[in-house]
Amino acid sequence: MKHGMWKPWTLGIGAVAVVALLGVRAARVAAGGGQAGGGTASRLLAGSIDFHVHGLPDMEPRSVDSADLARTAKDRGMRALVLKNHFDPTASLAYTVRKQVPGIEVFGGIVLNRTVGGINARAVEHMTQVTGGWGRVVWFPTRDSEYQVAAEVKDNPASKRPSVSVSKNGALLPEVKDVIAVIAKHQLVLETGHSSPQDSLLLLAEGKKQGVQHMMVTHGAFEMSLAQMQEAVKLGGFIEFVYRIIPMKDGANAKFTPAALAQLLRTIGVEWCVLSSDLGNPAYAMPTEGFGEFLSKMLAAGMTERELAQMTKDNPARLLGLPAS
């Protein structure tokens, strides 16, 4: 797996330092969550949607409780959050957070890893029936995907474990098509998860065939070539780009400079790109702060505020079926 972006959560600093760091961050959340570049970041965050963010509760360490995350995002003027958990559906969590923090739209979804039965159409159908109907996103396997597990085993043979496949011999499995039928029926968002580039394109092609209206390649640039991303767009898929794809002050691994990423976004077409944070790991910035930092860096790299609004407001709203802001 290139760039190390999908490996299980590991701490980049010592345990004692993490405890201290979380204490400082908890205080910052209580005070409003930091400034992330001050006025520029605040202006860019206003009305935005973070389509990919992790909060507590979770089986993995996270930097912030989901309700506190929503409060901070609301205070910064953000419109909505999509809560992601690799192992537990978040439709119920979205309902609860909405009750706790009125004034910001919160959505959830389901990731088709082994904890929900893998490729499980019934689990997806059930998610749509949770109170509120805020479960809107279906991610194909992430941590348990055949592609990710194979990469982990290549790096460390002792990590061998069961995985979840979406295809065999270049064709999608029947149960995958069943899941896509449920996505189409309820007009959910199809996300490719941690699938291989080839499998991601198969998922998008089947989604298009079955009439799915909302599709996105999960942090696509980590694994896909430009040609593959362009093919995904032809199939109707948005391409997601997240915080750690460019260098950040916390030392996160990066694939592009901000200027190179700006060029890539324009080559693909900003009307088909979504910028998200994918934050919540305590080793990195607090989610809202990091999202603001990401957008500020892209503005400094020459992107216009209108282009950034397209990728953080208009396109995410379209995916979620929300009216334009």
Question: What spans do the regions from the language model cover?
Answer:
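Acidic (Asp/Glu)-rich catalytic clusters
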Residues: 42-44, 74, 94-103, 126-133, ...
